[in-house]
């Protein structure tokens, strides 16, 4: 989904979980069926989850078992924190709308602007990560712009006490070209 303004996006990946040590697992490490269940398909869904008490942001996930039509055991409707110190997640989708056969993206758009998901050839993902612990000296206030999002001001990233949290931050991004597109 596309988060408006500087709100985070969410993204899901449908897949047959790989067999690791005789067990298929979801994004939280929970088993998905048995090794003999070659037909299981899940959607690992990722987004930002904020702890209501500490106000700490994390990358979270949960898994929908498409084959069984329910949340995978150990997962649930709420995102479960997976990686602490992730303040924001933004996603863009590379499409080729030139009508050619290059199979290379001609532009990147947000989820709301994808008219045909079979046209998506690549995914561009960016996260804003923080140092988890406060640093000294306090970092200079600045704006962070992740892909197409509105600027996210460091002064707006508050700690549990309601004050700016004095953490170092860095934007990381990558582009993933999808191999299973035709």
PLM regions: where:
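Low-complexity, S/T/G/P-rich flexible repeat/linker segments used as non-globular hinges
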Residues: 163-182
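N-terminal pilin/flagellin-like segments and related low-complexity appendage regions
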Residues: 1-126, 132-168
């Amino acid at each position: 989904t596309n988060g408006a303004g500087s709100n985070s996006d969410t993204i899901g990946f449908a897949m047959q979980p790989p067999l690791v040590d005789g067990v298929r697992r979801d994004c939280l490490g929970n088993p998905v069926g048995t090794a003999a269940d070659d037909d299981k398909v899940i959607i690992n869904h990722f987004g930002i989850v904020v702890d209501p008490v500490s106000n700490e942001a994390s990358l979270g996930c949960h898994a929908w078992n498409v084959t069984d039509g329910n949340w995978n055991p150990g997962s649930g409707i709420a995102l479960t924190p997976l990686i602490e110190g992730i303040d924001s997640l933004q996603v863009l989708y590379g499409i080729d709308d030139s009508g050619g056969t290059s199979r290379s993206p001609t532009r990147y758009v947000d989820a709301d602007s994808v008219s045909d998901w079979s046209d998506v050839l690549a995914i561009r993902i960016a996260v804003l990560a923080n140092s988890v612990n406060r640093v000294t000296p306090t970092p200079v206030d600045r704006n962070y712009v992740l892909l197409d999002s509105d600027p996210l001001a460091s002064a707006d990233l508050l700690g549990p006490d309601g004050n700016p949290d004095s953490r170092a931050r860095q934007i990381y991004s990558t582009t993933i070209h999808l191999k299973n597109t035709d």
